[in-house]
Swiss-Prot record:
The keyword Metal-binding does not apply. This is Cytochrome b6-f complex subunit 7. Belongs to the PetM family. The chain crosses the membrane at residues 5-25. GO terms for molecular function: electron transfer activity. It comes from Synechococcus elongatus (strain ATCC 33912 / PCC 7942 / FACHB-805). InterPro entries: PetM_cyt_b6/f_cplx_su7 (IPR012595). GO terms for biological process: photosynthesis. Component of the cytochrome b6-f complex, which mediates electron transfer between photosystem II (PSII) and photosystem I (PSI), cyclic electron flow around PSI, and state transitions. Pfam families: PetM. NCBIfam families: PRK11876.1-2. It comes from the Bacteria. It is found in: Cellular thylakoid membrane. GO terms for cellular component: cytochrome b6f complex; plasma membrane-derived thylakoid membrane. The gene is petM.
């Protein structure tokens, strides 16, 4: 049970920053594309 909770917490700790970075990167790329047009 404790291992399961730790695994889930680890997933959140890893996925949340990765998701935020990915989202920011995508927004940046879209902004650059719009600026070029």
């Amino acid at each position: 049970m404790a291992g399961e909770i730790f695994g889930t917490a680890f997933l959140f700790i890893v996925l949340v920053p990765v998701g935020l970075a990915l989202g920011a990167f995508l927004l940046k790329v879209q902004g650059v594309q719009k600026a070029e047009k």
